[in-house]
Curated annotation (Swiss-Prot):
<feature type="disulfide bond">
    <location>
        <begin position="100"/>
        <end position="114"/>
    </location>
</feature>
<dbReference type="GO" id="GO:0005615">
    <property type="term" value="C:extracellular space"/>
</dbReference>
<dbReference type="GO" id="GO:0005184">
    <property type="term" value="F:neuropeptide hormone activity"/>
</dbReference>
<dbReference type="GO" id="GO:0042438">
    <property type="term" value="P:melanin biosynthetic process"/>
</dbReference>
<keyword id="KW-0325">Glycoprotein</keyword>
<feature type="glycosylation site" description="N-linked (GlcNAc...) asparagine">
    <location>
        <position position="39"/>
    </location>
</feature>
<keyword id="KW-0732">Signal</keyword>
<feature type="region of interest" description="Disordered">
    <location>
        <begin position="62"/>
        <end position="88"/>
    </location>
</feature>
<dbReference type="GO" id="GO:0009755">
    <property type="term" value="P:hormone-mediated signaling pathway"/>
</dbReference>
<dbReference type="GO" id="GO:0008343">
    <property type="term" value="P:adult feeding behavior"/>
</dbReference>
<dbReference type="InterPro" id="IPR007733">
    <property type="entry name" value="Agouti"/>
</dbReference>
<dbReference type="GO" id="GO:0032438">
    <property type="term" value="P:melanosome organization"/>
</dbReference>
<feature type="disulfide bond">
    <location>
        <begin position="93"/>
        <end position="108"/>
    </location>
</feature>
<feature type="disulfide bond">
    <location>
        <begin position="107"/>
        <end position="125"/>
    </location>
</feature>
<protein>
    <recommendedName>
        <fullName>Agouti-signaling protein</fullName>
    </recommendedName>
</protein>
<dbReference type="GO" id="GO:0031782">
    <property type="term" value="F:type 4 melanocortin receptor binding"/>
</dbReference>
<keyword id="KW-1015">Disulfide bond</keyword>
């Protein structure tokens, strides 16, 4: 009985090892130094050289000015969008296609009615007849 358990445990370990080894990508299956040299994907000659350039004061000032212009243009654009006032509703009512759960007031449109679905969990004001 102990021999069969030992044999099954050894078989299980080998199966786990071979399963993990079979899922490795081909680049990671290196056998010797020659294959390591031939399969190396990192070549230092392939990368371009990096040069570091110091910025002078004039270029810094130009970039700051450009940044300030961009900021001011963004602020002006946002101010234009905000400037439109919304028309306030005259009475406390629910607009068409908005949520109108039972504690909410009635629908604003006289032709609309509150329709509920999914056991009154999703309610909205809808126009039922076009001839109203």
């Amino acid at each position: 009985m102990d021999v069969t358990r030992l044999l099954l445990a050894t078989l299980l370990v080998f199966l786990c090892f071979f399963t993990a080894y079979s899922h490795l990508p081909p680049e990671e299956k290196l056998r010797d130094d020659r294959s390591l040299r031939s399969n190396s994907s990192v070549n230092l000659l392939d990368f371009p050289s990096v040069s570091i350039v110091a910025l002078n004061k004039k270029s810094k000032q130009i970039s700051r000015k450009e940044a300030e212009k961009k900021r001011s243009s963004k602020k002006e654009a946002s101010m234009k969008k905000v400037a439109r006032p919304r028309t306030p509703l005259s009475a406390p009512c629910v607009a068409t296609r908005d949520s109108c759960k039972p504690p909410a007031p009635a629908c604003c449109d006289p032709c609309a009615s509150c329709q509920c679905r999914f056991f009154r969990s999703a309610c909205s004001c809808r126009v039922l007849s076009l001839n109203c």
